[in-house]
Design a protein with these regions (language model features):
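Anion-binding and metal-coordination hotspots
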Residues: 1-243
Length: 243
């Protein structure tokens, strides 16, 4: 081994391969930096729209399409927001998949409804979603599509004595109905189904299928990984049901 080191160092072919590898690595780093710089205007505009107090713009050079998001442990890291839609019947299969590079779920329920109908040929009668999806505009749109929304009503920000389930003067009919509905025991019972479906899928994806950290880069490839998980999950569900 001791004699092999100087021989390898003097071998022109080995040196050429190493130089080529270093050059490729440098070129790839430059391309990632260029891609990150191209993302800055979009990230800046998103920060302005969200009213963020911190104007600092951060773009990942490892994956320029990822965005810095708050994690469950309280830290901030580049990430993607994976969205799944799951049925609440006995099958409990995934019928919708999407990936976005925003930490907020705002505005995602409407396109997911369209995707579910496109994939299954059926529009759901009810939609059980987390509070982040419950924007008034989304509730109005769901009502137009004759879909009943079940989502937590946020507590009043200023007047903590006000009943959040009582409609406000500027509420639309759909939003007012949603507030009243979520104050009933029946709605609360229905909403509990979400924990046994959506949260189960999310836990399986992160804890058992490795979707807590992707081995690919870019929205398109991450969506491919999420879709592959959904396919695998559905096959395993059908097997467990004797299908």
């Amino acid at each position: 081994h001791l004699e092999a080191v100087p021989r390898e160092a003097a071998d022109p072919a080995i040196n050429a391969r190493r130089a080529a590898a270093r050059k490729r690595g440098a070129e790839q780093r430059i391309e990632r930096l260029k891609a990150a710089l191209e993302q800055i205007p979009e990230v800046t505009e998103t920060k302005k729209r969200s009213g963020a107090k911190d104007a600092t713009v951060r773009v990942s050079t490892t994956d320029p399409e990822a965005r810095v998001m708050k994690m469950g442990d309280g830290g901030f890291r580049p990430a993607f927001n994976v969205q799944f839609a799951t049925t609440t019947d006995q099958a409990r299969v995934i019928v919708g998949v999407d990936v976005i590079n925003r930490g907020s779920d705002s505005g995602q329920s409407t396109p997911m409804l369209a995707q579910i109908e496109q994939r299954t040929g059926v529009r759901p009668d009810e939609m059980l979603v987390a509070g982040g999806y419950a924007q008034h505009e989304a509730i109005d749109k769901a009502d137009e599509l004759e879909v009943t929304v079940y989502a937590p009503v946020p507590a009043p920000r200023k007047d903590d004595t006000r009943d959040p389930h009582e409609p406000l003067a500027d509420d639309s009919e759909a939003v007012a109905a949603w507030r009243k509905r979520m104050g009933t025991d029946e709605a609360k019972k229905i909403y509990k189904q979400r924990a046994a479906t959506a949260e189960t899928v999310n836990a399986d994806a992160k804890q058992h299928r490795g979707l807590d950290q992707f081995s690919v880069r870019g929205l398109k490839k991450v969506l491919g990984s999420a879709s592959l998980f959904a396919l695998t999950y559905n096959i395993l569900r059908l097997i467990s049901l004797g299908g």
